[in-house]
Amino acid sequence: MTKATFAAGCFWSVELLFQRVAGVTKTRVGYTNGTVENPTYRQVCSGKTGCAEAVELEYDPEKVTYNQLLGLFWSKHDPTTLNRQGNDVGTQYRSGIYYHNEEQKNEAIASKEKEQLKYKDPISTEILPAGVFYPAETEHQQYLGNY
């Protein structure tokens, strides 16, 4: 299995999107690329941790490619809005692709360049190495999938 990590607003709906993909074998929501170890949801929502709400997933590259996952990521949100998706506002809702290897990095950069052609405004999505991923509290895991 291969890991991928994406941030595209509230992690509940992002997780649900990827849970429905054939070839994705595991998802978990959490916090990444911040400055606080083991942050809580409340701390992340304060905007003082630097963390993004993100989804870390495991997938079978024989069944779904990283490029296909990137396509879903881009389709899920407006990557031109900085630190905002819909009514959710704050740095924790930023758009991000957090790569786990050089191949993912290169594919992410290429997909961002291709995606930019669709927009007048610049894409604000950050592409960074995957940092430490802190799983969110149990009540946030598979939140929308449970309803």
From Swiss-Prot:
Which branch of life, at top level? Eukaryota
Q: Does the keyword Ribonucleoprotein apply?
A: no
The cross-references to InterPro entries, in alphabetical order and at most eight, read: Met_Sox_Rdtase_MsrA_dom, Met_Sox_Rdtase_MsrA_sf, MsrA_MetSO_reductase
Which keywords belong to this entry? Oxidoreductase, Signal
| Gene Ontology molecular function: any one | peptide-methionine (S)-S-oxide reductase activity
Q: What is its EC number?
A: 1.8.4.11
Tell me the enzyme class.
oxidoreductase
Listed Gene3D superfamilies:
Peptide methionine sulphoxide reductase MsrA
Q: Give any Gene Ontology cellular component.
A: cytoplasm
- Family the UniProt entry places it in: Belongs to the MsrA Met sulfoxide reductase family.
NCBIfam families assigned:
msrA
Q: What does this protein do?
A: Has an important function as a repair enzyme for proteins that have been inactivated by oxidation. Catalyzes the reversible oxidation-reduction of methionine sulfoxide in proteins to methionine.
Q: This protein is called what? A: Peptide methionine sulfoxide reductase
Q: Which organism is it from?
A: Dictyostelium discoideum
| Organism ancestry | Eukaryota, Amoebozoa, Evosea, Eumycetozoa, Dictyostelia
